[in-house]
Amino acid sequence: MLKIYNTLSGKKEIFKPIEEGKVGMYVCGNTVYDFCHIGHARAMISFDVISRFIRHLGYELNYVRNITDVDDKIIKRAEENNESTQSLTERMIAAQREDELRLGNKMPDREPKATEFMQEIIDMVQVLIDKGFAYQGTSGDVYYRATKFKDYGKLNNRKLEDMLAGARIDVEVAKEHPADFVLWKQAKAGEVSWSSPWGEGRPGWHIECSAMSTNCLGSHFDIHGGGPDLKFPHHENEIAQSEAATGKEYVNYWMHCGAVRVNNEKMSKSLGNFFTVRDVLAKFNPEVVRYLMVSSQYRSAIDYSDQSLLEAKVALERLYTALRQQQVAESFEPTVFTERFEEAMKDDFNTAVAVSVLFELVRELNKAKTEDANKASLLAAELRSLAELLGLLYQDPEYFLQNSTVSEGLGEVAIQALIDERTQARKDKNFARSDEIRDELASQGIELLDSREGTTWTRS
């Protein structure tokens, strides 16, 4: 029984699809004016894992993730680069796909671009005007009447006035109310634009997603996801637009992944702690980055640092070491490990617990290597199968172990984790694994000193 934390209700709910056996999921994608940063990677990997597990449960999933390819930021960046908006967005879309493939993601079933749905956007704006939910201001821009939608604020469980108090709202004389937001912008000279009943212009950000999602998945669909910063105003505005236009409930389950913090601070260019995926992959194996992202439950915040990636590298090496020179059966009968892994994933896609199950499986696998070769090969197959649902352990073990190193040494947390594992291995009389860990630490310049009180270490 799959349970999903629904932002709309603020609690975990049993998942019940609108149509039995089928799931429609829309995730807000990137505005393609720059390279993907690690916050984008967190969202993309989270929903990739979610989509994998939904399919694993036997559902026919239609996973749609949009591309925002018309926006003020795109226009500004194209001007700075002295290139067309189309040239810029095509370059950034290609770069994003390259980054995702390196991170081990599978592509969504459909990636609609805003520029491909211009007529559908215009049609939805017109419906909102006809129903009295939108109006053309004195500036010529078209705005949504936020006060007319009685459920405005339901996603964030706040009243309109409260949300305005804590939000950055553009004060424009052309608007009837400070909370009203733009649906269609009048074009400025030289900007990319489209013809509409309200003159040459382009759509606002929020209406793009309403039009694309409802055209790709229908006016009422199962899951809508995105990053933590999209709850307000973007997703709140999507609900207001879509439900006003269609007269139906828009989405059943709203999912938001956690933020990525850098050295326990918010990631921002002004703080100088902003990292693109490409920055990170220049130093770390892509699978190490992926492991860091899935080692926490998708709603939890992740603290990104070189140290956290080094610890992720050590953990992933432990998994790959278990598969090194290990026969892998072609098929296997699921054991208690599969049961516990699935139980964790059914509990709001708890990848943190699922990953811990992989390490329990590895301990059993290492023990079986010296006791029962056939059992070891079956457990290795089960490990590969479960890890694939997280997008892990897809490389050849020897290749990964030879290519996962970075210039920095192991941090204290990573060293202690290995020492703790070695202590447990010795208690279990798994001396082969104990020796492996000692050798692994020695290769990193770490010397272990065993005594009655325990194990200490020094750097050689």
From Swiss-Prot:
GO terms for biological process: cysteinyl-tRNA aminoacylation. Keywords: Aminoacyl-tRNA synthetase, ATP-binding, Cytoplasm, Ligase, Metal-binding, Nucleotide-binding, Protein biosynthesis, Zinc. ATP binds at residue 269. Its EC number is 6.1.1.16. It comes from the Bacteria. Binds 1 zinc ion per subunit. It is found in: Cytoplasm. It is an enzyme of class 6 (ligase). Its cofactor is Zn(2+). InterPro entries: Cys-tRNA-ligase, Cys-tRNA-synt_Ia_DALR, Cys-tRNA/MSH_ligase, CysS_C, Rossmann-like_a/b/a_fold, tRNA-synt_1_cat_dom, tRNAsynth_Ia_anticodon-bd. Belongs to the class-I aminoacyl-tRNA synthetase family. This is Cysteine--tRNA ligase. It comes from Marinomonas sp. (strain MWYL1).
